[in-house]
Amino acid sequence: MNKDTTTPQKKENIAQDIEGFLQELIGGNDLSVDKHRKPSGRKAILPALVLWSGVIIAVLRGFSSQLQIWRLVSWEGFWHYSQYPVTDQAVYNRLADERGQEAMQALFYRVRDGLKERLAPYAQQKLATFATGVYAIDGSTLDKVARHLPKLREVANGDSKLLPGKIVGVFDVRYQQWREMLHLANPNQNDKFVATRLLKAIPVGSLVLADLGFFSFPWFDTLTDNGYWWISRLRNKVTYEMIHTFYQNGDTFDGLIWLGKYRADRAAHAVRLVTFSIGKVHFRYITNVRNPLQLTVNNHHQRWWL
């Protein structure tokens, strides 16, 4: 593992640059995230934009407690925001309010869109030029939490109750940035549970690189029916029927197949099967990009299939 050789001063400079970028993106008055009012109808003393921007700054500056967030917004102030006369408990209550999720999400979307504008000159627009965009979808179970709290000490090590859930996201391959991220409270939840929700973040006509956690014939048909291109690894023991061979030489194959050997469990659309070997490793992929001229398999493009 490579050691981090960045000096403390350089780290501080990087953090300041990031904070300046964030202030430019979300520090203006044109972004409103105050969608919820008090029961009395009055606006909260501490605007949601200030509170949740403060949370982001707290993470960037390495704060370790909610008390430091309260001090930031009520004592010190930051950016062009003045101090807000609120109690520490008021800040704690706001941070625990589930409605704050929408405000934080709005801030993250602003940062995401701002980053995309800056990354535009470096975007890999030559990747799969036939597609509107190129996106990868994947899910990952979060690491277990430490058993510091009394209630958690009673939970056996290895119990799924120690897992804080999982995240499932959409990654923009051309721009090399996350476009959407969802949290699932159940760590054992199947990724396919949120598959259709993820599609809302992906423009029609895009190429979707699907992880095996999303593998299912109905999912592939849904993508095709809704105007998406897709690529997926072929799951072991999946049956299929050969339709046409474009090319075959040893372990290398390119052709059309029906997923599902029998009509009762067959996918609605024919797909393209591509297989090849690199060293001793054999790869098998399926895609609805059925024209070999659109998505070729050679040394230059093999990264698509890996």
What are these regions (language model features)?
Residues 133-135:
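Conserved beta-strand elements of the Class I
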Residues 75-80:
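Blade-loop segments of beta-propeller domains
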Residues 1-70, 84, 93, 98, ...:
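Single, function-defining residue in the core of a domain
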Residues 121:
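Active-site-adjacent helix/loop segment of glycosyltransferases
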Residues 90:
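Residues in the helix-turn-helix
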Residues 154-155:
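Conserved mixed alpha/beta core segments that line enzyme active sites in large multi-domain catalysts
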Residues 117-118:
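Phosphate-interacting basic helix/loop segments used at nucleotide- and nucleic-acid interfaces
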